[in-house]
C-alpha cells in the first residue's frame, strides 16, 4: 500500500506532510521551503507557474496571477462580490451562476474553475511528496475549514480528483490541529479550543481529548474572514492616504495594486513583532510631472485600529461554540492558535481575554494542520494506532416544507458519519410527485439557507393529502458530504441524489479536467526537456567558440571549416528553437569536434615524439664535455 499524504490546502499557503517512522514530517518543496504559496500564474507563452515562482512574478503579471482561490471554492458568483473586489485578476460568471477565473494564455482568453486552479496547487504538493518519497503518490487527506459547507467540501474533493489524487478524507482544519497537538497527550483528558484564523477563513472548534479519542463537541466560524481582509484594510488605508496627497487612486492600476498588496502583507507581518514599519514603494506611479514614490510609516496602534472590528467578529462564534458544546470558558484547559493570522498581537489578546488564559503557542500555526492531516492519513493506512476521530457537521441539514420553512433532519454539531430518516407527506389531494429541496444552514426560512440541490420522487399513487408516507433519509459520510434519498413507503419506489456541488461539475467534467491536468503535466515535462536541450546546446556553442579561440590555429583547415559550419547550424537551430533539428545539430557539432580533436591529439603526439628524438641525438654526439680536474692528497690539503 502506497503512502497517504496529508495536505493543508490553504488560502495563502499550502503544506504537505507524511508519516515517517511513526512521526509526522513536513516535506520541503523544490524551492527549499516548508510552505508553498497558494498561487498559480500563467506566463505569456502559456506555461503555468505554481508556488513561489508564481508569487515572484505577480507584480509584472497581475491579471494572470491567481491567489486566494480557496475563497471562491464551491461558491456562487453572487456570493463572492466582496472577494472579487479584493483581487486584480478577472473573475466572471459561469454557467448556473458559478465562478470562473479568466486568464489570457498565449493571446487567447481561457476560463478556469476554482477547482482547476486548486488542482494545480495540489499537483505541485503531490510532486513534492513524490520526489521526497521516491514513489508515486495517489491518495491524500485534504483539510478544509470546519465551517465549509457541503458544496465547498465537494469542490475540494473534485480539485483532488483533478490533480490525480484519491481523497481518502476531507478533514476539518481545527480537528487536524487538535490531532497534531494531542497525539502525544492521548492518556490525558483535556477540553481544548482551537482558534483557527487563516488567510481567508475563520473557525473555532471545541474538542474533548481522552484515551486516544478526539471528539469535536461544537464548531463555528466565518468563511468570509481572514488575513486577506486585514491586508485589504491596510491597502485601502495606504491608497486613501496616497490619494489625498497625490490625487491618484492606486487601486485602479493592477500593477500598482499588486505592489500595494505585497507591501501591505509585509507590513502586517512586520507589525506582529515591531511597533512600527515603513511602507516604501518607489516609482509606484507617474504623472506628467514625473514619477511618484510612496513612503508611509504605519504604527501597530494604527493597524490595530484598522482591523479592530474584524477581530471583534471572531468573538460571537466563540460564544456560540461554547454554548453548543454546553461548556463555560473556565472549562477549557488549552487554547490552541492555528493559522498565520494568529501571530497578530491584537488577535492573541482578544482570544486570551475571552478565555481568561494564555494561549498555547507550542505548535507552529503554519504547519500544524498539515501535520494533523498526515496523522489522519496514518490512521487510515494503519500506521497510527489507538486514535479515534469523531468530527461533526458544521451546519443544520434539512429540507424545505410547506410555507417555505426549513425542517431540520440533522442538526449542526451532530457527530459524523451519521444517518437520519424522517416521514413526510403530501400537501395536496391526489399529488403524484413531490419535490425534495435539500438545504444547509442555520436560518429558519428555506430562502435564507444554502440550497444544495433538488430532486423529484414521482409515481406516488393518488390519495388524499396527508395519507402518502414519504421517508426522506439523509446520510453524511466521514468527509461531511451528504447523500439524500426519498422512498414512497406504499410502493417502495425510491429516488436518491448525490448532492452535486454548486460548482456544477459533473463526473464527466471532472474526468476531462483530470485528463487535461495529466496532459499539462506531460507538457510541463516536455517543456522542461526542451529547456534542458537548449541549455545543452548553449553550453556546447560556448565551449566550441572558446576551444576554437585557443586551438583553432592548430587544426587542419578542412576540419576547422567543418566545425565552424556545424557551429553556425547549431546557432541557427538554437535561435529558432527548432527542437526537431536540435538533437542532430548537437550531434553534428560533437562529431566534427571529435574528428578534429583526434587530428589535434595525433599532431601533438607527433610533435612530442620529434622533441624526444632530438634530445637523444644531442646526447649521442658527445654533447657532454668532461671538466679538467686535479687530485689533491688529503695530507697536502692539510698542509695548505
Curated annotation (Swiss-Prot):
One of its GO terms (molecular function) is unfolded protein binding. CDD domains: ASKHA_NBD_HSP70_DnaK-like (cd10234). Residues 607-619 have a biased composition (Polar residues). Signal peptide: none annotated. Gene3D superfamilies: 1.20.1270.10, 3.30.420.40, Actin, Chain A, domain 4, Substrate Binding Domain Of DNAk, Chain A, domain 1. InterPro entries: ATPase_NBD, Chaperone_DnaK, Heat_shock_70_CS, HSP70_C_sf, HSP70_peptide-bd_sf, Hsp_70_fam. Induction: By stress conditions e.g. heat shock. SUPFAM superfamilies: Actin-like ATPase domain, Heat shock protein 70kD (HSP70), peptide-binding domain. Residues 600-640 are annotated as: Disordered. Keywords: ATP-binding, Chaperone, Nucleotide-binding, Phosphoprotein, Stress response. Residues 629-640 have a biased composition (Acidic residues). The keyword Nucleotide-binding applies. The keyword Signal does not apply. Acts as a chaperone. This is Chaperone protein DnaK. It comes from Rhodothermus marinus.
Amino acid at each position: 500500500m502506497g503512502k497517504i499524504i496529508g495536505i493543508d490546502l490553504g488560502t495563502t499557503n499550502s503544506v504537505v506532510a507524511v508519516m515517517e517512522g511513526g512521526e509526522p514530517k513536513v516535506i520541503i518543496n523544490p524551492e527549499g521551503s516548508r510552505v508553498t504559496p497558494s498561487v498559480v500564474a500563467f506566463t505569456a507563452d502559456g506555461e503555468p507557474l505554481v508556488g513561489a515562482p508564481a508569487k515572484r512574478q505577480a507584480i509584472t503579471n497581475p491579471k494572470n496571477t491567481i491567489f486566494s482561490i480557496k475563497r471562491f471554492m464551491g461558491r456562487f458568483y453572487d456570493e463572492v462580490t466582496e472577494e472579487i473586489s479584493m483581487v486584480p485578476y478577472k473573475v466572471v460568471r459561469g454557467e448556473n451562476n458559478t465562478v470562473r477565473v479568466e486568464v489570457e494564455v498565449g493571446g487567447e482568453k481561457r476560463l478556469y474553475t476554482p477547482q482547476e486552479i486548486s488542482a494545480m496547487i495540489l499537483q505541485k504538493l503531490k510532486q513534492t511528496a513524490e520526489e521526497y518519497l521516491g514513489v508515486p503518490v495517489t491518495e491524500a487527506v485534504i483539510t478544509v475549514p470546519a465551517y465549509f459547507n457541503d458544496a465547498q467540501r465537494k469542490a475540494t474533493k473534485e480539485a483532488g480528483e483533478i490533480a490525480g489524487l484519491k481523497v481518502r478524507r476531507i478533514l476539518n482544519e481545527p480537528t487536524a490541529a487538535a490531532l497534531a497537538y494531542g497525539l502525544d497527550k492521548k492518556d490525558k483528558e483535556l477540553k481544548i479550543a482551537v482558534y483557527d484564523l487563516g488567510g481567508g477563513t475563520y473557525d473555532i472548534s471545541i474538542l474533548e481529548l481522552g484515551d486516544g479519542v478526539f471528539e469535536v463537541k461544537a464548531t463555528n466560524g466565518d468563511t468570509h474572514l481572514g488575513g486577506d481582509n486585514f491586508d485589504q484594510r491596510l491597502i485601502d488605508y495606504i491608497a486613501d492616504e496616497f490619494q489625498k496627497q497625490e490625487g491618484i487612486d492606486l487601486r485602479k492600476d493592477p500593477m500598482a495594486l499588486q505592489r500595494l498588496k505585497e507591501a501591505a502583507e509585509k507590513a502586517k507581518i512586520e507589525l506582529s513583532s515591531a511597533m512600527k514599519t515603513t511602507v516604501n514603494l518607489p516609482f509606484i506611479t507617474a504623472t506628467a510631472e514625473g514619477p511618484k514614490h510612496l513612503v508611509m510609516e504605519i504604527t501597530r496602534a494604527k493597524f490595530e485600529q484598522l482591523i479592530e472590528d474584524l477581530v471583534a467578529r471572531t468573538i460571537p462564534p466563540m460564544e456560540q461554540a461554547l454554548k453548543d458544546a454546553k461548556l463555560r470558558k473556565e472549562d477549557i484547559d488549552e487554547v490552541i492558535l492555528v493559522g498565520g493570522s494568529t501571530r497578530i498581537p491584537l488577535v492573541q489578546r482578544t482570544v486570551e481575554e475571552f478565555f481568561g488564559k494564555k494561549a498555547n503557542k507550542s505548535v507552529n500555526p503554519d504547519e500544524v494542520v498539515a501535520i494533523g492531516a498526515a496523522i489522519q492519513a496514518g490512521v487510515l493506512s494503519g500506521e497510527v494506532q489507538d486514535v479515534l476521530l469523531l468530527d461533526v457537521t458544521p451546519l443544520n441539514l434539512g429540507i424545505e416544507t410547506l410555507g417555505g420553512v426549513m425542517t431540520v433532519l440533522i442538526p449542526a454539531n451532530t457527530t459524523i458519519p451519521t444517518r437520519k430518516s424522517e416521514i413526510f407527506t403530501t400537501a395536496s389531494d391526489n399529488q403524484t410527485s413531490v419535490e425534495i429541496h435539500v438545504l444547509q444552514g442555520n436560518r429558519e426560512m428555506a430562502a435564507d439557507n444554502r440550497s444544495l440541490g433538488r430532486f423529484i420522487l414521482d409515481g406516488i399513487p393518488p390519495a388524499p393529502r396527508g395519507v402518502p408516507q414519504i421517508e426522506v433519509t439523509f446520510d453524511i459520510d466521514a468527509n461531511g458530504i451528504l447523500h439524500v434519498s426519498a422512498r414512497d413507503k406504499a410502493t417502495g419506489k425510491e429516488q436518491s441524489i448525490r448532492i452535486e456541488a454548486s460548482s456544477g461539475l459533473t463526473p464527466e467534467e471532472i474526468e476531462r479536467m483530470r485528463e487535461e491536468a495529466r496532459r499539462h503535466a506531460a507538457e510541463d515535462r516536455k517543456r522542461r526537456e526542451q529547456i534542458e536541450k537548449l541549455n545543452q546546446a548553449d553550453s556546447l556553442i560556448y565551449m566550441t567558440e572558446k576551444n576554437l579561440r585557443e586551438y583553432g590555429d592548430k587544426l587542419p583547415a578542412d576540419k576547422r571549416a567543418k566545425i565552424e559550419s556545424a557551429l553556425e547550424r547549431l546557432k541557427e537551430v538554437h535561435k529558432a528553437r527548432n527542437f526537431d533539428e536540435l538533437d542532430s545539430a548537437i550531434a553534428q557539432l560533437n562529431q566534427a569536434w571529435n574528428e578534429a580533436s583526434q587530428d589535434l591529439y595525433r599532431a601533438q603526439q607527433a610533435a612530442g615524439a620529434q622533441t624526444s628524438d632530438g634530445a637523444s641525438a644531442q646526447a649521442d654526439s658527445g654533447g657532454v664535455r668532461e671538466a679538467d680536474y686535479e687530485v689533491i692528497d688529503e695530507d697536502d690539503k692539510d698542509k695548505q
